[in-house]
């Protein structure tokens, strides 16, 4: 096993798009889980806003302009339920999508693709992420890792000689459980919208409140989190050396990133109760 560093933010949509395009978030533009698009929050995994599905209103191909897999037609072995999603169009377009209904199908579908002469096959399994969110790191998580190890073993048995298998995670996770901090009402009153997720939040301030909001966030939460302005983050290259104008526009003005195993939520929009969470920069 080799320890690697994922992208910022360490979240599924951002990391998977970097895997399939070879580009950092600042270039591909999927800069987080919930992204501000015209003062509405796009859930980048579900490609929905508060109005429901928006695949016809927010074009995935325009939103994420980098061609996946450098334009090669690659078989993608992934859960069947994702085959026609907006996010799939954004980060897997042009691929030959081979959906599986059960994880046990993966080895055979991969083997069939290789036997047809494909030089690269891409596969995705989301079970460990789900278990981590629901149960956290521990016995359930370890049991799921054992399940993955079995699947990997089955894949290895089907591969012809001189075929390599690379297994990687898209991000890590920490146990948060009930360590949840409700964002102060005075902060919310100075904020137009909050994008991102509970361990990497972007604040989009109301006009004239940016400086005061930065100070107050530091005063309230610096014990638990990093507070950075957008310019600091861009100058330090968190999203890569090149950040497109399109990606830059989607960022808020101030970022709040959990340093401790905590989550930040809005009282009126707490989201699902999760034990394991990701999104920040911690190991």
Model-derived regions: residue spans:
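Feature captures the catalytic ectodomains and active-site-proximal regions of enzymes
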Residues: 1-283
């Amino acid at each position: 096993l080799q320890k690697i560093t994922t992208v910022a933010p360490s979240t599924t949509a951002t990391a998977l798009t970097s895997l399939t395009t070879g580009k950092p978030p600042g270039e591909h533009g999927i800069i987080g889980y919930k992204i501000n698009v015209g003062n509405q929050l796009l859930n980048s995994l579900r490609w929905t806003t508060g109005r429901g599905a928006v695949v016809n209103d927010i074009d995935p191909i325009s939103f994420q302009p980098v061609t996946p897999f450098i334009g090669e037609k690659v078989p993608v072995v992934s859960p069947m339920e994702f085959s026609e999603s907006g996010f799939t169009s954004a980060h897997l377009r042009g691929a030959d999508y081979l959906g599986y209904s059960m994880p046990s199908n993966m080895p055979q579908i991969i083997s069939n693709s290789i036997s047809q002469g494909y030089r690269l096959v891409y596969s995705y399994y989301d079970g460990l992420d789900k278990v981590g969110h629901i149960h956290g790191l521990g016995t359930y998580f370890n049991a799921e890792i054992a399940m993955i190890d079995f699947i990997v073993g089955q894949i290895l048995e089907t591969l012809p000689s001189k075929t390599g298998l690379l297994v990687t995670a898209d991000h890590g996770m920490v146990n948060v459980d009930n360590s949840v901090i409700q964002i102060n009402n005075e902060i919310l009153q100075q904020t137009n919208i909050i994008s991102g997720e509970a361990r990497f939040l972007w604040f989009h301030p109301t006009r004239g409140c940016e400086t005061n909001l930065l100070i107050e966030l530091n005063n309230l939460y610096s014990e638990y989190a990093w507070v950075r302005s957008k310019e600091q983050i861009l100058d330090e290259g968190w999203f890569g050396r090149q950040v497109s104008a399109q990606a830059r526009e989607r960022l808020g003005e101030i970022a709040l990133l959990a340093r401790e195993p905590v989550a930040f939520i809005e009282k009126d929009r707490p989201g699902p109760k999760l034990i394991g969470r990701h999104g920040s920069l911690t190991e």
